[in-house]
């Protein structure tokens, strides 16, 4: 596994990449649907990963009809999610070691997410990570959500780094599409969805966890140093 260029900055997705929250969203929406007595399946939920509410609402109406109580479900869904997060907000393996490496190498990093700033602040605060990221790009900071390139382009702009020299770390299909459209190098770390060939072709590599990423970064920089010496 190698990266095509030396890494100058890293842009992280959040849900399913930094935090093991996608499974909590899945549990919460099924519980909420049961509470309201409406249909919802894991198959339909998986279409929501890495996408904003407007997209999710459309998916619900397409799957279950225009009379589906999407807004009511959203309220119950978020209520159950917040209850689950209280005792189950787990970091993904390798997060802290990777952030330590970036500090050691002096590489800036940012988060690019479809979640709200308040959600990001809560999750980072729960694990003492609020000061580990130079910038947070969240809902409201860009015109178009993933799979459009906007979140990653805004992150690169805030970091002051050419997008081509940024490494994007993503777990979702739309996240990979977004980072690819922004011109970034991509390592996908799949969570609930395995990448089809179309998505694999957009990635420098697909890793089993964030534990694999430090070696990729150090190797890319070592190769650059050797080439310039």
Feature map (PLM): residue ranges:
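N-terminal helical cap/lid subdomain that shapes the substrate entry/recognition surface
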Residues: 3-105
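Conserved G/P- and acidic residue-centered "switch" motifs that form tight phosphate/ATP-binding loops
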Residues: 13, 17, 113, 171
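Short glycine-rich loop/turn motifs that provide flexible caps or phosphate-binding loops at active sites
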Residues: 15, 49, 93, 109, ...
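Short, contiguous strand/loop micro-motifs
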Residues: 16-17, 44, 85-86, 111, ...
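Conserved SAM-binding loop
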Residues: 18, 91, 109, 144, ...
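Structural motif
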Residues: 48, 112-114, 169
